[in-house]
């Protein structure tokens, strides 16, 4: 295939081509092959609308799904070239931030692989979130241009007029083909405008937020610490849903829809609250077509479904009416009508769409005017029903359902850990590639020492590969015989990276005191903090200070290393996850809706160190609690602390020398000598005077359980059994299973 591709594009042999030319030729050929595959069809079509799609690099993923990966790799190897090196040329699409976007990407893969008729709809961000740089142990943000002249983006002739208050813009739709595993293709539709001006971004990621026609699709989640930034988010969200709604109605009509039967032709999944305005926008468009308000509302309610991803109040969006009047005045009469109908039916002001502060609650609109509300892990859904959305659950119990998240095994095993995938195939065949529950067959090898030793060797090889990568990219040398303890996820206080770095401080102090671990420990972090999230950036500062302090201390560094991976993204996750021994999933119980990193680590043979939060609950049920390290207060206890407002972090600090020593070290002379006093003191005071996510509540138990995990690691056969149990029981967490459940219970696509 490669020979023909480069000959067709450049008239050269493989040997005569640069890696860049080979990459460009493969991109063109793979795009053409994907376009030739039949599209998924059916009367009813799903539109998965999301502000984020963290899709990762696509070359190898598409080659795997098209059944060409082994052929291309072998052909390049025979010519003395490397597919891995060629893939390094590919920029990672910067279209997402964290779990929300990665989940959407996994879902698109599974929707296509299962042969379902469903496309993604989002925005074509030119600079994405941001590129993370470190200087003076602080995070700095720069723009992240990822769109090459040749890319997976296919410009279409589809465009729509989108009206805002006082102006109109014309969109342009770009498509990325979504290849199914040995199946048909779907599309990811990304909308943009051609008046975008990348040159308005000056220092870092600063730009004029009021220049909507120039900035609308520059960044994902523009800084919302001021009114201009918040307004820009409203403009972005409406631009996304207006295009989506126009596309949906156009395609539905082409399939024979009369609009009065829209729900028979269309299912819309609202992924978190960012696309919520699709509800009033569709009602607006349907009434403009002559439908009555009653009929339009009924049709939209039977078409839209909502996925809730969080119980954090900050993430349940509420937009001031003043913003909506300015940006999208045409929606306000409809939103007011929707709220009026809710008020006529219910006395409980908690369920109103417009609150007493004149803010529009997006989630409330989704619940009232959608036919399904789902959480993303068993515990999360139960918390929604029992407390956070209990008032709505009492009204609409039939709407609420759980869909535990999943991951695509094609990317997170076949692609990122081929040696492990090949080993599994040699043991149980390749049926697990399309039916992940077949991994359960691995359990019959749990006492086979030859298999267990091979599993340990595969893990060690992955650690060597990661060590080489970090040495080349960040100049940090790691010991592959050390324990790789990894926490990679969006930086947020509820995810408690601060607790992990307090453990690092504790271990540093122990080593300085002469108490050395039996085996060296490598603690690896990867995380970006939102530009305006001050405490999150302070936590990164502390991690970077500890990295400098620990790694340069000859007394400590042989036993402990700290690594903060710069500009963490999907590509780096693909290198980190296969090498992980201990997966850090330490969010405050009740706060993590699900998590999917926990599933990726499990599939790749890491053992979970975690709280009973999100999908950790189900992971420990499937793999067995004896094969994980569970600690911390339960969700019930945490929720009670919040209800009574009786958690005082200072109490825990004062009664424990272990906690006191670790926290005090944040403002010690050693750290202040290399860190920024303002950042460190602010974090220190936050932990002692607020600690909203209860770090100190669980810290002592975390230290004890983590030390036990490190001690247990020394029994290599016992540890390998834990690894095997995790891999064998990961099948439930395939996104194919999740999507089958969505389709059976919510979408009902043929």
Indicate residue ranges for each PLM-predicted region.
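A conserved ligand/cofactor-binding region detector
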Residues: 1-750
